[in-house]
Amino acid sequence: MISMEDQDFSDCSIIMINLDGLRKDRIQKCPTLRTIKEDNIYFSKMISVSPYTLAAHHSIFSGLYPSQNGVDAYYHMFRFKEDIKTFTEILKEKGYFTKADVISENIIPKRGFDEVG
């Protein structure tokens, strides 16, 4: 397994677009998304670790299964473990400005973001 903490991202701009509930076959119907897909890195075989958004997104940000990161059930949805470092925290440590544009701030772990809105 490759650790993000050991990587040099100094020449990279990173934009992560996560659209909850978007079927991948619909990307071709949207010219903007189609262009982004064709001109950048696109992960075509992603499989969700959870059937609901909160656990799935917290797993994306932590790199851990819901049972490991603490967001493993509807009743534990806001108990993201404090000792887990998110990839946004790692990017911030590497000098990145990190920003999230989300409908609900509860959807993602806020740690490591300079701005959430």
Explain the meaning of each model-derived region:
Residues 10, 56, 94:
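Residues that flank catalytic or metal-binding motifs in active/ligand-binding sites
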Residues 1-50:
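Active-site-proximal N-terminal segment of extracellular/periplasmic enzymes that hydrolyze or transfer
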Residues 35-36, 55-56, 73-74:
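Short linear motifs at secondary-structure transitions and domain/linker junctions
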Residues 29-30, 40-64, 78, 100-112:
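Short, solvent-exposed turn/loop segments enriched in Gly/Ser/Thr/Pro and often Arg
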Residues 64-117:
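Catalytic-site neighborhoods of secreted/periplasmic enzymes
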